[in-house]
Structures are given as C-alpha cells and as structure tokens.
C-alpha cells in the first residue's frame, strides 16, 4: 500500500498484520526503508531506479524485507511521483489507473518511453543477498504473458542460474520494447534504455500463448505447496510422521523376514499425486530390524497431508485491538484559520524579489539555502551515495540560519530530524486524507502540503494535528526521472544551462523540462495552475505559489495579485481540484 494513513490505522489495530510498502512510496534509500519499517511495514517494494549497490545495501541493513522489480514495464518517472496521467487525463498512477501517456510521441520521437526491464541474469545474486520477493510487472498484460514470464523466473530462482539463450528469446518474443534493459541496476543510463513496442510475428506469440494455455489445461502449472517431512521409527515409540506442524503416529512390528529400509519409506512418502503438495525436504530415521507395511506408510502419508490440507483451510487468526475501527481523535484537533501565502522558487533572484512582500515562508532549493539561510527544499530524489553531499549542504544552510526543510520523501524526515531541522512535508508525500496527516505528524512533520490530486471537497473534509499548505499557483510537477531527457532533446549534449527545454505533445502543448539535483529532470505541466478560492473555507492555513520558470518580475506580479485579490491574465488550469481523478 501507499497511503500512510491507512497503514497507520491497520498497524494500530492489527499490529501483526503484514504490511507491504508499495513502490508508489518511492523508497530508494536506506533511510526511507528504515522509516517504512518503523511505521510498521514488514516489506518494502524498492523503486525500479535502485542500482545493484543500493538494493544490496538496503536489503542487508534496513531490517525489513525487500521486494525488487525484475521484469516488465519501466516507468520513466519514479513511481509515486508521476502525475502526468492524472493531470492530463484524470487517471491517477497513484491509484493504479495510469493511462501511460509517456508511451505517446512527443517532440524528438518517444523521449519518455523506456524499454522493458529484464534482470533475469541477476536473479541469483538478488537471492544471495536475501531479497525476499522478485516482482514481475504484469499490468494490462494477458494471463499467458504472466504465466510464461513467471515460469522463466521461477526456474532461474529455483535452479540458481542465469537464463539460457532460449529463455531470453522466449522473454523477447512474448513482449519487448526494442529489447530489454538493466540500465538502472547496472548504472548504465542513457539512450540504450529507451525503446518502443516491438512487433513480433503473431504466429510466434500465439505459439507461446498456446503452449502456456495447454500446460495450464493439463494441470502441469498447478501451484504446489512445499512440505517438509520428518519420519522416525523406533520399536518403543512407534512410527511418527511429522509434516509442517502436524503429526501421525502408528505402531511398528519386529521384522520376521525383510525389514523396512529408508529407501522403501521414502518411496511411499513421496507419492503426493492428487494433492496440492510436493515434498521439498525429507528426513528419515528408522531403527534396524523393523517392519512397516507399505499400506501403513501410505495411510500415514495420506492422513498427514489431509491434516495439512485442513490446517490450510483455517483462516489465520490475527489480534485485533479493541476500540473503534475509525477513531476520530486525530481529526478533531483545532487548527488556526488561513494565515497567508507561502512560495517555492528555483533561484536566488526569485527569492530576493519576493523578500519584501510579506509571504509566510519562501522555500528555496537546498543549494540556495546554503547561500542564504532561507528554508530549504530537499531534492525529492537523492541516493545514498549522494547523501553526504546533501548533509554537507544542510550543514552550510544551518550555519547561515536555515532551520526548516521541505521534505518530499519519507526518507527525508529522519535525516532532517537527526540534524535538528523543523520538517515541513511536500506534495511528494501524497497526503490525501486526515489519517495521513496524523501519521505524518507522528513522524515529526509540522506542516504538510496537501496532494494536488485531491478535490476541494475532500480538502475541506481533512482534519489533523498539523498545519496544511495547498498549492494554488504554478506549473505542477508531472514527472521526475533519473534519465536526463534534456540531454536527449539536445542530441546527447548537456544543455541544462541553456535556458528551458520543452517537450511538445501531439496537441502542441509545450511541457517545460527542468534540471534537478544529480542531473535528474522534472517535467512541468504545459499550463500553470491558478486557483482563486476562499482558502479560509477550505480549512488550510497557507496557500503556496510554486514558481519555476517565471522571471523575478513575474513572481512579484503574481504574488501581489494573490495578496490583493486582483485578477491575473493568462491561460491557466484549475488542475484536479475541481475535476478529481479516477
């Protein structure tokens, strides 16, 4: 799951209920994985962008199970931070309904379409490190696709080996986009990771699908449950067959002629046909000179497996703490009324221009905070390798007077708290409801920017123990990605300092591309959001003006219009506040 509020609710009332943190939580650092563990998650699904070294580090040191994507579609954007489908088509990727607009053509071809992921050659080492689960992306794929790909990876995992040429070809034929990539895993980013769907001759695909369907129809693909057996036989205690927590006991006799051997016992016990079980491990200890008829051993096996079957049919019990399922104590905290406006900027010049307008808070990029001492925006994405640089900049910012950071990932919160900063939560934490506000407050957040995927009616209903901020102006950030699309738009040359780069879609809408920390990119909406409402009625304490490509003079003009209530000229959008998402 992604929703922190729902996770908090479940963990509070059913603490032994297993919670898995979705890839939509954008967990890609050790701090983020540990924070998820501390919230109550037992497993984290890591971002697809994690490198080999990052996966190994988190798996070995986070103290929580890890799940890793090994095959299937690769999103250009970090999962959980993509709002493109929601903003342009009302189908939210954060709710599992992405319409995949990144696969469409833009200026320069298909600059947002990556090849499918394939880590078939790395399964053995993932297993060796202790990765708990391998994840195969199968959304919007046929059942036969899921069966074929899963069989290949299951064989590789069970046999602890690399794929054969034939297996690689099977994966290619069943679906690919100009081949596959392991670029994030191996750290080889760039043009080789991009591709569009490859058309494979239909007869080749049909043959694979037919074979998969035939295996299923014959029952060859029926899922079997592994069982460990322990059989002991002694004259004084009899024969005891134990199978994963159940036991069957029968008397034994002294052999008159031919005693029963361990080989004879194993032959009888391995006959599991017609059951959902297969024998994974077996240990046999039998005293010499005993006779156990085959009919007795067969009966013991049947009885033990019947007991196991009955045991599997009983739903596991979970401790559910008494009390209301939906406690409302965290939704009744009194909050101040609307106080005024905040702003985020990208440059020192923008911040300087806004300094005298009396805004509640002006947040600046961390690099600018290190020069000015203003509240700092942490990069939404940075790796464990980059964290020392982040900590150095935070130290410089604190020495100049910065005491507050804007955090867009759960991993930022413990880092900022360790260093003594007040933490304000950014939109990247995807706060949709009152329960999430309460969860974030418990984590140490004192002000939270609400999700811009929420409707105004939902925002009015939100209550919680912390202040809330609402983005009301600016080009909304639609994607953030690890691969540099700016470089690709300029023929492979680094062009981040040469003004704003745009992607143009089929409708001739122009989407600005901006460089981010670590040579990452953010894709902005083609039109700025402009919401003019009675913010006091919405229940928020502050409203944010999010400045990106505006000049300092434009920042001042727009801020003054909001402060005075004057009209603004231009082409704007209300975003999703009135339309909502599916």
Label each residue range with its predicted role.
Residues 9:
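Phosphate-binding/switch loop-helix module in NTP-utilizing enzymes
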